[in-house]
Swiss-Prot record:
KW Transmembrane (keyword) present: no
Signal peptide start and end residues: none
Gene Ontology process terms (BP): microtubule-dependent intracellular transport of viral material towards nucleus; symbiont entry into host cell; viral penetration into host nucleus
Modification note: Highly phosphorylated.
GO molecular function, one term: DNA binding
Motif annotated as Nuclear localization signal, chain positions: 1-10, 445-453
Alphabetized Pfam families for the sequence: Late_protein_L2
Primary site of residence: virion
Gene designation per UniProt: L2
Designated name of the protein: Minor capsid protein L2
Membership in a protein family: Belongs to the papillomaviridae L2 protein family.
InterPro entries referenced in this protein's UniProt entry, alphabetically: Late_L2
Function: Minor protein of the capsid that localizes along the inner surface of the virion, within the central cavities beneath the L1 pentamers. Plays a role in capsid stabilization through interaction with the major capsid protein L1. Once the virion enters the host cell, L2 escorts the genomic DNA into the nucleus by promoting escape from the endosomal compartments and traffic through the host Golgi network.
Amino acid sequence: MPRAKRRKRASPTDLYRTCKQAGTCPPDIIPRLEQNTLADKILKWGSLGVFFGGLGIGTGSGTGGRTGYIPVGTRPTTVVDIGVAPKPPVVIEPVGASEPSIVTLVEDSSIINAGASHPTFTGTGGFEVTTSTVTDPAVLDITPSGTSVQVSSSSFLNPLYTEPAIVEAPQTGEVSGHVLVSTATSGSHGYEEIPMQTFATSGGSGQEPISSTPLPGVRRVAGPRLYSRANQQVQVRDPAFLERPADLVTFDNPVYDPEETIIFQHPDFHEPPDPDFLDIVALHRPALTSRQGTVRFSRLGRRATLRTRSGKQIGARVHFYHDISPVVPDELEMEPLLPPASTVGSDVLYDVYADPDVLQPLDDYYPAPRGSLANTTVSASSASTLRGSTTAPLSGGVDVPVYTGPDIEPPVVPGLGPLIPVAPSLPSSVYIFGGDYYLLPSYILWPKRRKRVNYFFADGFVAA
């Protein structure tokens, strides 16, 4: 019989809270939490005759009381609180009985005598004021005696500021745009009107590039990942999936935009018109793709297979697709590999035959050397046939069938000539002219030394 699995009991604190009022507590819960165990009773009875001070000996945590544990033979550390530095006291001087009690705060100012005489000054009588009766305004001549006019003229040709198409030689009298004609006190500026080129007009489209390397107007947008492993692939054969996909999910006819995501609200139990669209709560916007030689209309859907208590719906993603039409592969026109032979007239058919009297037997040809691949082709044609239009391989003693029809000119390969065998060279004598010569060391026959091996004890060692 299998042993029952032991379940852990709740903590004593949790049991004490629930079973105290009901009176169903185990016998060890209440004495432990109310400090009424046998050890607590011994400490209570022993404390009547023994005083332990503030050590805090009991069933609680051993913290040593408020003062903590102090090692034997040492004094406790004393913390000295310095606090804020004291300010020096204000010394108050006592006032004697003979001194006045009124303290003068402001010193006496000097007394001014209002009846004093005016001071007398010695010397000149001051500035002299001169008056005039002339009413004409004063005119000051500030113009110098000699008038000088300065005119600056400059002419330059700089291709950086002038377009190459309109570069011309400077004309007579052409000056720059800054001419100053002035005197010592006044001046006037001369200028030249230059037409300005308009870079932007009000009638533009607003899409003109504003930099040297503008971004392209159309950017590639990443398409939906329809064929991932997380999506269930379902093929829909009903053509209503292209225009009215909502009719396959529910029977009612909601107003919706076929280019946007469709959200469905279903009751707890419902049966869709198409069983492939069971538990579908959302159909995303359509997408046109090309896969496996067909044009495919696709929509991603989301099922609501499970529903949690919080109201969240959990389900798989489904890829619904409908193949519209197959993509026909492009047909390429085949061209002949060899060009057609040049004929005298168009659509001319002629016969080709071989003359056996002109041919020579194949035995007259030299045999091909062994070890190489040699193809010998013998061709013959009648005198009435165009030269080089047709080649017919012939062999001695075998009839070659000849057919009628247009000829194709093959590439001309030059044939190999007759092979003449070369006689092997015979060894001949070598004559050396001269008085002094040296032989190579490899041709010098040195005498070989024979190593002597002793086979007797008297010779010093024994052969192994």
